[in-house]
Amino acid sequence: MMEDEYQLEYFKSEGLTRNICSSCGKAFWTRNPDRMVCGDAPCEPYQFIGNPIFRAKTVDEMREAYLSFFEKQGHTRIDRYPVAARWRDDIYLTIASIADFQPFVTSGVVPPPANPLTISQPCIRLNDLDSVGRSGRHLTCFEMMAHHAFNSDEKEIYWKDRTVELCDQLLTSLGANKEMVTYKEHPWIGGGNAGPSVEVLIGGLEVATLVFMSLGKQKTEKPPIELEGTPYYPMTLRIVDTGYGLERFVWASQGSPTIYDAVFPEMVSHVMQEAGFGHRLHDSDFIHILGENAKFAGLMDISGQRIFELRQKVAEKIGIPTDKLEKMIAPVESVYAIVDHTRCLSYMLGDCIVPSNAKDGYLARLVLRRTLRMMRELDLPDEKLGDLIERQMKIIGLSKFEQDPDVVMEIVDREVDKYRTTMERGARTVERLAQTYKKKCEKIPLDEIITLYDSHGIPPDMVKDLATSQGAVVDLPDDFYSRIANMHSESEQIQEKNPLFDYLDRLAHLPETRKLFYERPGSMEFEAKVLEIFDGQYVVLDQTLFYPEGGGQPGDTGLFLTPDGLTVRVCDTIKLGESILHRIDGGNVRKGDMIRGILDEDRRLSLMRHHTATHILLHAAKEVLGAHIHQAGAQKGEYSSRIDIRHYKHITPEELKKIEVVANRLVMANSSTSIAWEDRTDAEQKYGFCLYQGGVPPGSRIRVVKVAGDIEACAGTHCAHTGDIGTISIIRVEHVQDGVERLEFAAGIAAIQHKHHQEDLLNRSAEAFSVQVEALPATSKRFFDEWKEQRKEIEKLSSRISELESKNLETVDYNGISVLVKRLDLPNPELVKVATGISDKGGIAILVAGGETARVVVSSGQKGVKAGDVISTVCAVLGGKGGGKPTLAQGGGPDVSKIDDALAAGESFIKSALHV
């Protein structure tokens, strides 16, 4: 379908021919017309191990060589983006350099930061997680060196021929022989786009992919091209999307046995020494086997095949027993994986991802716990993880990370503690599950194992070991972690049907509503023309001061005054497309009327104060707690508001006080609030992606709000000066989910009202004790201490009473079994003590205590009489229910007038059970 796309003038001018690979059947371009294979693994094994392709370079040297080369070719070098894709709402991690420019640049909404540009972008992909360390080439975290050009009808930068020419020139500049290079045709599809691409292969290794993104799913007037059953249409932009693997270039320049030896020499050596394998680094036989293994391990694809089967193939090819290869290679593969994972965690945590059980935090915890599991296999202490991550951060360069390394270490230490707790608790959960499936004579399903990991954090290896010891059967796929990562790699897009969408077609002919709330934020009254009324309930004006619900801020309410002098209540305001709808409560508003709108001033001012205070609190929390603080949600209200923030531990009372003090100092500084519409690309380059605390707004221009150091893209209404807020009072902090803390607060008059409420509570409490407020802490402590002592005395007396009652109780003998059925108005613990005193001797007891409700305890020392059955009968008479074990059950009911009837029913049940 795309064959014509690869007929490049550059290929022809350089004398390349198009051949078909005898192994995979795919087309490729080569300078050697006699070449039969494409040069990709597994069609061709690695040729560069021990025989480097490029001049030897380190990671830093290779990166600089690449970026400098493209700068000399007219490209602008730009800084890397974070690995946490804060500017995207569809993915959590930056998976490619082009992801930096999606969706707004690639769709043509905004211009690129430079054109053409070059970048070396750290990326994280976890879809091959189980292959890392084993294949010799897979990484979770890698740098995608890239050059991008964005071509339009108005401006052509360069396209396919120049892209391939630049690739050839780069490879040659690094010392490669062009005659060895092949370009393999590979139609590319991803993220709703498509286009031709070529894989750049040399020495059996794919070192780059050159994608020519020119097709999209959005329908245009031009005819579509069908790919994999889906029609794709020519895009407005034609984008050069290249990806050169930095680590693969370094590997090919050194010819080392694996990519890990080339990229992480210091870390591999360090971890090998720590694990007791340091001597192997100087063992020539080991190095030889490692190199031979790496050549064929390039064929390994963990998905679809078992590790053991693949290991057998490699062992056979290099001529050693499988068990010997496994014993030699497996621990080293774990070392490689640990080194890779700790670099991945350095970027994740250094770029302010907080481990949790959701979103990007889930993925960080997944990698972290997998690392700990492998460390334990090598007998490396858990505490060593923090040291390894710190070493990686220093190698990369601490200045390249936003997060303070000390905070990273604290996060890691806490995650290690959580992992230990999970492992301890998980054992009991797994044992129960194993017993269940053992009784069924069934294998534990994979779904159950996934649930154990997803919901409880219990690793699959632990499940297998414990379940096997219990006699249950577990069959784990070798790509378990890759499957889990793929399940959580993308944001779930839930789009609820908005009933107002039915109005969109009717709104299409109307002009955009003029937003007076931006032009005159301090005004509370305005005049406007009624353009449309939907179903007598939703009014569209030509302009409005009413702010529509959005960004966690409720829509404004107020009044309309009609030309007839009638007052109409505005209950809510909603934005739909480019129009603003005012929901009215009855009233006679006519199309074409000029109405007067009046906002509920107190409510609007309160919402403005709370919205501005939200920005200030977020900034204060970041100042007190660390750079990782990121908004996880917010809701503004008239009387109180809340903001959810990502944090790795519970906020302490002392930290809460500091946040409140910092916030109020910012209020008292009375700084001006700056609001301006800016080009998205310019704003991102100036302020970073902390702009998108409240989500990613659409459009080429975004409304940037600067409040006391906090800078965000925000559509809400704000105070002109921080001093207009008055004061901020934090009401409470709540742990809403793992890794998320909620601050509830009040601002302005609402904060004063909250303070008054707190004072009222204190005064009423002081009055109850007949003391001054200042004496309340000491007095309440004294009363509490006295109450505890009195409770102990009461418990002693109750225990003594129950002992005396037990001695004086007369039981009834039914067929040689002592039965006690009686009302005893004692606390529950004493009722249980009396009842079990009877059942311990083989008897049966039914005891009921009165009060506001009836309380029942049944205890049975007879297998033929289950306490749970008896209590159901007794409690049913009382209008309640109960339950428990066969030997002891408790319950009750609200109808205390039926206690005697309930006792009689219970006794009758026992007599029947004992055949009396």
UniProtKB/Swiss-Prot annotation:
CDD domains: AlaRS_core. Its cofactor is Zn(2+). Its EC number is 6.1.1.7. Zn(2+) binds at residues 611, 615, 714, 718. Binds 1 zinc ion per subunit. GO terms for molecular function: alanine-tRNA ligase activity; aminoacyl-tRNA deacylase activity; ATP binding; tRNA binding; zinc ion binding. It is found in: Cytoplasm. It holds the Pfam family DHHA1. InterPro entries: aa-tRNA-synth_II/BPL/LPL, Ala-tRNA-lgiase_IIc, Ala-tRNA-ligase_IIc_anticod-bd, Ala-tRNA-synth_IIc_core, Ala-tRNA-synth_IIc_N, Ala-tRNA_lgiase_arc, Ala-tRNA_ligase, DHHA1_dom. It comes from the Archaea. It catalyses: tRNA(Ala) + L-alanine + ATP = L-alanyl-tRNA(Ala) + AMP + diphosphate. Belongs to the class-II aminoacyl-tRNA synthetase family. PANTHER family: ALANINE--TRNA LIGASE, CYTOPLASMIC (PTHR11777:SF9), ALANYL-TRNA SYNTHETASE (PTHR11777). Consists of three domains; the N-terminal catalytic domain, the editing domain and the C-terminal C-Ala domain. The editing domain removes incorrectly charged amino acids, while the C-Ala domain, along with tRNA(Ala), serves as a bridge to cooperatively bring together the editing and aminoacylation centers thus stimulating deacylation of misacylated tRNAs. Catalyzes the attachment of alanine to tRNA(Ala) in a two-step reaction: alanine is first activated by ATP to form Ala-AMP and then transferred to the acceptor end of tRNA(Ala). Also edits incorrectly charged Ser-tRNA(Ala) and Gly-tRNA(Ala) via its editing domain. This is Alanine--tRNA ligase. It comes from Methanospirillum hungatei JF-1 (strain ATCC 27890 / DSM 864 / NBRC 100397 / JF-1).
